[in-house]
């Protein structure tokens, strides 16, 4: 009986050691696999002016976050051309990271306590606040004027919750319509199917035209982080250190793109 117990303890210890070894390998594996394949795969938006926008003439995605992704590729692989960009939106960026289609996501991904339980976030590389884009003819001056308004937001974004809470705080009710991407929201605004387009202000800047304006209101500061899988602590640390060490370069890139 004593012998059996000893064997059981030994088996449990061995299993624990294997799990720990496996976890350690998984943690270190992402960075090594990127170096091994010689390419960093990053999920970026393709519909956000200044951040990451598809150039219809060349087929390339260009913008601030694309340049940050290239800077990360250069840091890891020594060459900013050793990168593959995968277009994502607010609804697909998490699943594509989960299933391994991308190594990291740099796509206006707001850091929240809920999301930090699911993913690893670097420290913020950019900070913004949520705003409202409206048609000038509506004569809105602030959210307080928008009782009963229908506000267009992106699917799976933090915007709906932030604006909903702000509206409740000032005692008005608003409705929401969710869309798969930002151009769809702008089209709905232009067609007067929604009364406002709400997302982070620097994103809205890319959609302002002579018929629309961004209201002065700002809601819930948004901090963007580079996102990696939760089971990659070594890679997450590398990415976090990268953001800290390249802060000045990243800030310069933001200015380059008018942010």
Curated annotation (Swiss-Prot):
Residues 1-26 form the signal peptide. Gene3D superfamilies: Periplasmic binding protein-like II. InterPro entries: Bact_solute-bind_prot3, SBP_3_CS, Solute-binding_3/MltF_N. Keywords: Signal, Transport. Transmembrane segments: none annotated. One of its GO terms (cellular component) is cell surface. It holds the Pfam family SBP_bac_3. It is found in: Cell surface. SUPFAM superfamilies: Periplasmic binding protein-like II. The keyword Transport applies. The keyword Signal applies. GO terms for biological process: amino acid transport. Common antigen and a major cell adherence molecule. Most probably involved, with PEB1C, in a binding-protein-dependent transport system for an amino acid. May be involved in binding to intestinal cells. Belongs to the bacterial solute-binding protein 3 family. This is Major cell-binding factor. It comes from Campylobacter jejuni subsp. jejuni serotype O:2 (strain ATCC 700819 / NCTC 11168). The gene is peb1A.
């Amino acid at each position: 009986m004593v012998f059996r117990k000893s064997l059981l303890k030994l088996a449990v210890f061995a299993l624990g050691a294997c799990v720990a070894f496996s976890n350690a390998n998984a943690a270190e594996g992402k960075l090594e696999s990127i170096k091994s394949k010689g390419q960093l795969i990053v999920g970026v938006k393709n519909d956000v002016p200044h951040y990451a926008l598809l150039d219809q003439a060349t087929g390339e995605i260009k913008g601030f976050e694309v340049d940050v992704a290239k800077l990360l590729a250069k840091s890891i692989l020594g060459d900013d051309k050793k990168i593959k960009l995968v277009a994502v939106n607010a609804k697909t960026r998490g699943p594509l990271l989960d299933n391994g289609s991308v190594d990291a996501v740099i796509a206006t991904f707001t850091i929240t306590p809920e999301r930090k339980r699911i993913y690893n976030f670097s420290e913020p590389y950019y900070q913004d606040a949520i705003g409202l884009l409206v048609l000038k003819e509506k004569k809105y001056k602030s959210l307080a004027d928008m009782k009963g308004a229908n506000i267009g937001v992106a699917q799976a974004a933090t915007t709906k919750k932030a604006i909903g809470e702000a509206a409740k705080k000032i005692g008005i009710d608003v409705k929401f319509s969710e869309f798969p991407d930002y151009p769809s929201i702008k089209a709905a605004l232009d067609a007067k199917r929604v009364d406002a387009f709400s997302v982070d202000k620097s994103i809205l800047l890319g959609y302002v035209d002579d018929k629309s304006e961004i209201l002065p209101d700002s809601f819930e500061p948004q901090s963007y982080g580079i996102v990696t899988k939760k089971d990659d602590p070594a890679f997450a640390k590398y990415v976090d250190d990268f953001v800290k060490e390249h802060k000045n370069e990243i800030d310069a890139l933001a200015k380059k793109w008018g942010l």
